[in-house]
Each structure stands twice: as structure tokens, then as C-alpha cells.
Amino acid sequence: MALTKKQRAELRMKFGGRCAYCGCELPEKGWHADHVQPVARIHEQDMKAAEKGIFKLKATGGVRNIYADTLENQYPACAPCNLFKTSYSLEMFRKQISLQVERGRKSSVNFRTAERFGLVEIVAKPVVFWFEKYQAEGANQLPS
């Protein structure tokens, strides 16, 4: 669903002008309207690319979960959070974020070096999204 300028402005301010997930401040432009419950966009193979031996999918414009394509199901998100979330549910997104430390430790010599020299300290704590803090503490309690 395409949002009007007014709807987009209201959505941006839903959690104090911050990303619903990480809490970073959202710029006027460049942020995403995320579907909390994924809409699962329909893709098909790009036949022009296939003629060149390239496998490429393109969006058809359709969605599998049309019921989820509503304004009430949208949260404001920074581009990095929305692109990482893709079509995960909130709990699967939370799980994927919680796995990042171990993934970094396993696959990045830079991470392991920084950790070895005390530049990175691992803290075991649950992933709590900004919107959860915002709703629990109230808009007036959190920094703007």
C-alpha cells in the first residue's frame, strides 16, 4: 500500500521520530515503512536476464499476505534495520540479532582481534526493541 505524505509523516513520529527497532533518529527522508507482519512480496524470474544466463528475480508488485498490507501493520524503521529484518517475524528478527555476536566472533578476524585487546566487550542481555521501551516507559520518559 502506498502511503500519503501525511500518513508517512505520522508513521515516522509513531515512536518519537525514531526507528521502531534500534531507536536511532529517523531523517526526514531515507527511512522505511516496515511491515511488522511481513507481506511476502511475490517475485518471478526475470526472463531477459535468463536469456543472458543470469538468474534474477523481480518483484511483480503482488503480495502473498494482503491482510498484512495495512497502515496499522507498519512501523517506521531505519534502512539498515528494515533490510536486515527482511521478512522475519518480530521474534525471528530478535533471534537473528541475538546471533550477531557469535557470528562476528566466528567469521571476523577483526572482531576477534578487537575482543582480544579489550576493545569489544560482549554483554549477554535480551534484545529489546525501541518500540517496546517506548510503549513501556511512555513517550515522555525517553530521550528525544
Predicted regions and their residues:
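Histidine-centered catalytic micro-motifs used for acid/base chemistry in nuclease
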Residues: H32-P38
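Extended charged
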Residues: M1-E10, K14, C24-P27, M47-Y75, ...
